[in-house]
Design a protein with these regions (language model features):
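Single conserved hydrophobic/aromatic residue that forms the stacking wall/gate
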Residues: 1-6, 10
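A broadly tuned preference for mixed-charge, low-complexity surface segments
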Residues: 9, 56-69, 111, 116, ...
Length: 185
């Protein structure tokens, strides 16, 4: 099935020695949530198997969008994914937002959500299909697609799961102000 092409290539490259090297290096591992839902219901990509030192993605530039991926799942895998991510809505957009919630609520130190997933777009917005020529790297977000409703939804979920990042400039300004107070004394 097409939706598993990128995951099959990626998974084949993850030999025991590669996994061991990543663990020894201290670099964060990469967890692609779409890879969790295949015939293996004991997948290391399921969020309850994550360690903190990893980066979770709903999908990457080489994957289908989450909506496109969900549409192409087998009925068995779709049912398992819905049950695992707690998706009660029947519409594909409910599944996309449930995947985003699953990624954000995981223990992973970092979480990356492609904008196409926030916009609940299908595979017409896919970035790259590996080993193919043609329309790769051509998708562009249109002005106004990321509207205030979506921005607020992203903000609320990001805040809920403790993933808001303080601006470095705010921290830097506070530190500089504190130094000035000390030097004035």
């Amino acid at each position: 099935k097409e939706s598993s092409a990128a995951s099959d290539v990626y998974k084949r490259q993850l030999t025991d020695s590669v996994i061991e090297m990543v663990e020894e290096s201290g670099f964060p591992g990469m967890k692609v949530l779409q890879f969790a839902f295949d015939e293996n219901e004991d997948s290391p990509y399921l969020t309850h198997r994550y360690e903190r030192n990893c980066i979770v993605y709903t999908g990457t530039h080489d994957n289908e969008t989450t909506r496109g991926w969900f549409r192409n799942l087998s009925q068995h895998d779709r049912n398992f994914a819905r049950a695992y991510i707690g998706c009660e809505g029947k519409h594909e957009t409910a599944a996309v937002w449930s995947m985003i919630r699953a990624a954000m609520s995981s223990v992973a130190d970092r979480c990356v959500i492609p904008v196409q997933d926030y916009l609940c777009l299908g595979n017409e917005a896919r970035i790259n299909e590996p080993s193919t020529l043609g329309d790769n790297w051509k998708w562009r977000m249109k002005k106004g697609q990321l509207n205030e409703t979506i921005i607020q939804k992203i903000y609320k979920m990001t805040k809920l799961y403790g993933r808001l990042v303080k601006e470095e400039t705010e921290e830097k300004e506070k530190t500089e102000a504190d130094r000035e107070k000390i030097s004035d004394k």
